[in-house]
Amino acid sequence: MRKFFLIVLVTVISGLSLTACVSGSGNAPVKAVEDYLDALVKKDEARLSTLSCGEWEDDALLELDSFQAVTTRLDGLACSQTGSDGDTALVLCNGKIIATYNDEDQELDLSVRTYEVVQEGGEWLVCGVR
């Protein structure tokens, strides 16, 4: 009986460990988008560039430029991977970017675009929107 209990315990612990590893790597595209949006609202150009694929970097910097005259913050950010298209992970976020100018807030709904995230050099990078 003791041996059986030990085998069951080891099996459960092993299963939980494997689940943690799989879910951690599955969240990498989501984390990439969350980090990208954080860099965007903090106006961190260098970080935004490193979180963008080469093909998307110019677009990311244009988006950053559009926020230069306003104060920005994220509100209620929650992202999840909604699927994939070949090697591209699709990530949808809920929440808003709030842009403030002269004490007036403008809310930009994040759920209107789906982020395309690809793996380059072992890193997940934002590489477009739909």
What are these model-derived regions, one by one?
Residues 86-130:
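Exposed beta-sheet edge and beta->alpha loop/turn motif
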Residues 31, 42-94, 99-101:
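Short solvent-exposed beta->alpha transition segments
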Residues 17-20:
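C-terminal motif of bacterial Sec signal peptides marking the signal peptidase cleavage site
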Residues 1-8:
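Bacterial N-terminal signal peptides that target proteins for export
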Residues 26-30:
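Amphipathic alpha-helical repeat elements characteristic of tetratricopeptide repeat
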Residues 22-24:
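Bacterial signal peptide processing site
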Residues 36, 47-48, 117:
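Hydrophobic pocket/interface hotspot
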